[in-house]
Amino acid sequence: MRKRNESVTVEHERAAAAPAPLDKGCSLRHSLRLPAADTGMKRPLGRRHGLWFRLRRLIIWLLGVYIAIPFLVKLCPAIQAKLVFLNFVRVPYFIDLKRPQDQGLNHTCNYYLQPEEDVTIGVWHTVPAALWKNARGKDQLWFEDALGSSHPVILYLHGNAGTRGGDHRVELYKVLSSLGYHVVTFDYRGWGDSVGSPSERGMTYDALHVFDWIKARSGDNPVYIWGHSLGTGVATNLVRRLCERETPPEALILESPFTNIREEARSHPFSVIYRYFPGFDWFFLDPITTSGIKFANDENVKYISCSLLILHAEDDPVVPFHLGKKLYNIAATSRSFRDYKVQFVPFHTDLGYRHKYIYRSPELPRILREFLGIPEHEHHH
């Protein structure tokens, strides 16, 4: 009996000392919970690391592009030339330049002239408002003969981008026509429907060809030259050449002009992100002059002998106002203008005329009448 009791006691103690068997369900639950909790902690960390990696990769890529662009421009000066001319930007789109009436110019004729072999330029000739009714249904010969009527002529040289059918340009033609002027404008070679490759020399030669074409038909009527933005560079090139051959226009009007293309490029909003880049001039400005593009208005005005009117809006975001003012100061002190009128007309920021809306000014007709004089036909009214 004692042995049996002792064996029972030993077995009882062994059983008590042995660990209790774990519940299978409980064990499974624990084994599942622990990895799940661990994964939940790792997932946000993984997301954050992945987001940071992508952001870092984007920053490195953008930095690489930022650094590569100056070298690309330096190695390919033609890129800068295209950015100066922007002749590939044809706005407004889908207009037929052969049909100026589609732009509300019912008193306008479309011509094509050939300044050089393999170069053809599209020209618009808008007659004065007094001739609108007579112009209906007339052909090119009638319009050419009309240049000999007693109305002054304005040769308009537009800026970069777009065509002769640009909205703000068309609105200016209408204003000038209503004031009694013929308006002749054209697209330089490489712009609009004009054939050829753009260059400063080519643009200037196109303008000279159109000027001579006008003078051959306008008799003794005054011919004025009006340049806007990049067109001011063409205008001063042209007028300097005309003065050198002693056939100057009656007056030169520069709207939103700059001093020279290097200073304009340095001040242009596109250059902001690179303006303080080491070697900015070497990377960005030298390739422009390497391409033969100077448009040196500040030099040209020293050789121009005719009346000069400069119009500039203070809030111009493309050609800064101070460049127009600087050009005026150079011209006003130049000996070449000592016998001619030089006038600068600013337009206050509050008016909101910016780079291309000076035509909206109700003061513009008065400014032109006082500077150019009243067109002869208006004396009869």
From Swiss-Prot:
Gene3D superfamilies hit by this protein: alpha/beta hydrolase (3.40.50.1820)
Cited function: Lysophosphatidylserine (LPS) lipase that mediates the hydrolysis of lysophosphatidylserine, a class of signaling lipids that regulates immunological and neurological processes. Represents a major lysophosphatidylserine lipase in the brain, thereby playing a key role in the central nervous system. Also able to hydrolyze oxidized phosphatidylserine; oxidized phosphatidylserine is produced in response to severe inflammatory stress and constitutes a proapoptotic 'eat me' signal.
Keyword Lipid metabolism: yes
Glycosylation site residues: N106
Gene that this polypeptide is encoded by: ABHD12
Segments traversing the membrane: 59-79
GO cellular component: endoplasmic reticulum membrane; membrane
Catalytic activity field: 1-(9Z-octadecenoyl)-sn-glycero-3-phospho-L-serine + H2O = sn-glycero-3-phospho-L-serine + (9Z)-octadecenoate + H(+); 1-(9Z-octadecenoyl)-sn-glycero-3-phospho-(1'-sn-glycerol) + H2O = sn-glycero-3-phospho-(1'-sn-glycerol) + (9Z)-octadecenoate + H(+); 1-(9Z-octadecenoyl)-sn-glycero-3-phospho-(1D-myo-inositol) + H2O = sn-glycero-3-phospho-1D-myo-inositol + (9Z)-octadecenoate + H(+); 1-(9Z-octadecenoyl)-sn-glycero-3-phosphoethanolamine + H2O = sn-glycero-3-phosphoethanolamine + (9Z)-octadecenoate + H(+)
Chief location category: endoplasmic reticulum
Extracellular topological intervals: 80-381
GO BP: any one term: phosphatidylserine catabolic process
Catalytic-site annotation from UniProt: S229 (nucleophile), D316 (charge relay system), H355 (charge relay system)
Family matches, as InterPro entries: AB_hydrolase_1 (IPR000073), AB_hydrolase_fold (IPR029058)
Protein name as it appears in the record: Lysophosphatidylserine lipase ABHD12
Membrane topology per record: Single-pass membrane protein
GO molecular function: lysophospholipase activity; monoacylglycerol lipase activity; phospholipase activity
Localization per record: Endoplasmic reticulum membrane
Protein's organism: Gallus gallus (Chicken)
E.C. code: 3.1.-.-, 3.1.1.23
Pfam families: Abhydrolase_1 (PF00561)
Topological region Cytoplasmic: 1-58
Family: Belongs to the serine esterase family.
Keywords linked to the UniProt accession: Endoplasmic reticulum, Glycoprotein, Hydrolase, Lipid metabolism, Membrane, Transmembrane, Transmembrane helix
Highest taxon listed in the record's lineage: Eukaryota
